[in-house]
């Protein structure tokens, strides 16, 4: 009989969001008339920008002609999109990133997991706690951890607590690590890093030969012009960091799928014999072997993000969701609930009232307010006693959800 990958058996009972879906399904079957408002999973709700829709329509029509048809595209992405990304997202901010260093993909979630394909299994790994679960679970699946303890923490991972006491800013690891995941603006806490904080991480990584995997999926939501959007705005980051970005949240591409990863040329790791190896070459080889590229139609839609019309429309989308976040913060604060985040990120991280545990508060909101959020403990042991609410919904639903919560 075929052997399974037993590392999957080490995973906790369920990935956070499937467990939420299971509880919602059970509740909805018992309460079919309940009008649920979902402020849980970070899926957008507003329509795709018109500039992107029009660009995709043109691309579809092109595909219906002999001269405009496109089959397999380059695995790394079309040059015109890579150049637009490099120019608008990096070079305009002083980052020395060129088009060849951009790899277009179908999701930063995929890339942050798939990057493990090119990294050795003996690397010592650090994650924040709480943390986006994919970083942990992908390492478990790949056999890079031991078993989980009672709190859900896995042997072989270094956990860096982030909480109100430390301003949701992890401290530099006290034990040696080779690989660290950083996410700013942070999911789930909504915290953001200053230039000085990122410079400290880059200095640490360069001094200790550590690779930073930097998730910047929510950078478009940063409101303060003095805060960095990319780790490559920090001196020395090209030598120690890979960055993941996405069109999902700023341009509403959760259903159309387009993202990109930046792997600077010259960024190196060690082979088994101790020689230096460029990670760009390995990632390029990995993508060429395991990925067929994002569709031409979708990439044309993503390119339109960088048009004048597209920029105006995605800025309006971001402003819409950030207004939702401001409403959530205001109403929860008025209800006497301690809140964090929601100022430079579409997530509000709240302290559960009355010492309720995270899943208890989830069930409380579901049963009594018919509002769905995300239990903080699902993001790690240090998330216990916290809860995440997402700003991704209509204004009407956000207002109604807050009315219901305040009425509890």
Curated annotation (Swiss-Prot):
EC number(s) per entry: 2.6.1.83
Pathways per UniProt: Amino-acid biosynthesis; L-lysine biosynthesis via DAP pathway; LL-2,6-diaminopimelate from (S)-tetrahydrodipicolinate (aminotransferase route): step 1/1
Catalytic reaction annotation: (2S,6S)-2,6-diaminopimelate + 2-oxoglutarate = (S)-2,3,4,5-tetrahydrodipicolinate + L-glutamate + H2O + H(+)
Protein keywords: Aminotransferase, Pyridoxal phosphate, Transferase
One protein family per Pfam: Aminotran_1_2
Cofactor(s) recorded in Swiss-Prot or TrEMBL: pyridoxal 5'-phosphate
InterPro entries, per the entry: Aminotransferase_I/II_large (IPR004839), DapL/ALD1 (IPR019942), PyrdxlP-dep_Trfase (IPR015424), PyrdxlP-dep_Trfase_major (IPR015421), PyrdxlP-dep_Trfase_small (IPR015422)
Residues given in the record as substrate binding sites: 15, 42, 109, 132, 187, 292, 388
Keyword Nucleotide-binding: no
BP terms from Gene Ontology: lysine biosynthetic process via diaminopimelate, diaminopimelate-aminotransferase pathway
Superkingdom: Bacteria
Residues binding pyridoxal 5'-phosphate: 72, 108-109, 132, 187, 218, 246-248, 257, 292
Subunit structure as annotated in this protein's UniProt entry: Homodimer.
Alphabetized PANTHER family for the sequence: AMINOTRANSFERASE
Protein name (record): LL-diaminopimelate aminotransferase
Record organism: Prochlorococcus marinus (strain MIT 9313)
Gene behind the chain: dapL
């Amino acid at each position: 009989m075929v052997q399974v990958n037993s590392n999957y058996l080490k995973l906790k009972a369920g990935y956070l969001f499937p467990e939420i879906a299971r509880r919602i399904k059970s509740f909805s079957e018992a309460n079919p008339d309940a009008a649920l408002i979902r402020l849980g999973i970070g899926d957008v709700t507003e329509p795709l920008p018109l500039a992107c829709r029009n660009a995709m329509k043109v691309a579809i029509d092109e595909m219906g002609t002999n001269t405009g048809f496109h089959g397999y595209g380059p695995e790394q992405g079309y040059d015109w999109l890579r150049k637009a990304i490099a120019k608008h997202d990096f070079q305009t901010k002083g980052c020395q990133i060129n088009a060849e260093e951009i790899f277009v993909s179908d999701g930063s979630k995929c890339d942050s997991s798939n990057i493990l394909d090119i990294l050795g299994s003996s690397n010592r790994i650090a994650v924040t706690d709480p943390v986006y679960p994919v970083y942990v679970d992908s390492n478990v699946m790949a056999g890079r951890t031991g078993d989980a303890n009672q709190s859900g923490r896995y042997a072989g991972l270094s956990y860096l607590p982030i909480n109100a006491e430390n301003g949701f800013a992890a401290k530099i690891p006290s034990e040696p690590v080779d690989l660290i995941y950083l996410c700013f603006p942070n999911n789930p806490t909504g915290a953001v890093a200053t230039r000085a904080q990122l410079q400290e991480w880059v200095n640490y990584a360069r001094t200790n030969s550590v690779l930073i995997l930097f998730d910047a999926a929510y950078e478009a939501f940063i409101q303060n012009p003095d805060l960095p959007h990319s780790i490559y705005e920090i001196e020395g980051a090209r030598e120690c960091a890979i960055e993941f970005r996405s069109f999902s949240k700023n341009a509403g591409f959760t259903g159309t799928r387009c993202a990109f990863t930046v792997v600077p040329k010259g960024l190196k790791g060690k082979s088994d014999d101790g020689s230096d190896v460029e990670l760009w070459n390995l990632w390029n080889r990995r993508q060429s072997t395991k990925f067929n590229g994002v569709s031409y139609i979708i990439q044309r839609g993503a390119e339109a993000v960088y048009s004048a019309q597209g920029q105006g429309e995605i800025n309006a989308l971001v402003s819409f969701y950030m207004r939702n976040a401001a409403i959530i913060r205001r109403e929860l604060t008025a209800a006497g609930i301690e809140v964090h985040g929601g100022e430079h990120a579409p997530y509000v991280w709240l302290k559960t009232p009355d010492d309720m545990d995270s899943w208890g508060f989830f069930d409380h909101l579901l049963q009594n307010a018919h509002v769905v959020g995300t239990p903080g403990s699902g993001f790690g042991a240090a998330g216990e006693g916290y809860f995440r609410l997402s700003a991704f919904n209509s204004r009407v639903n956000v207002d109604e959800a807050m009315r219901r919560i305040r009425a509890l």
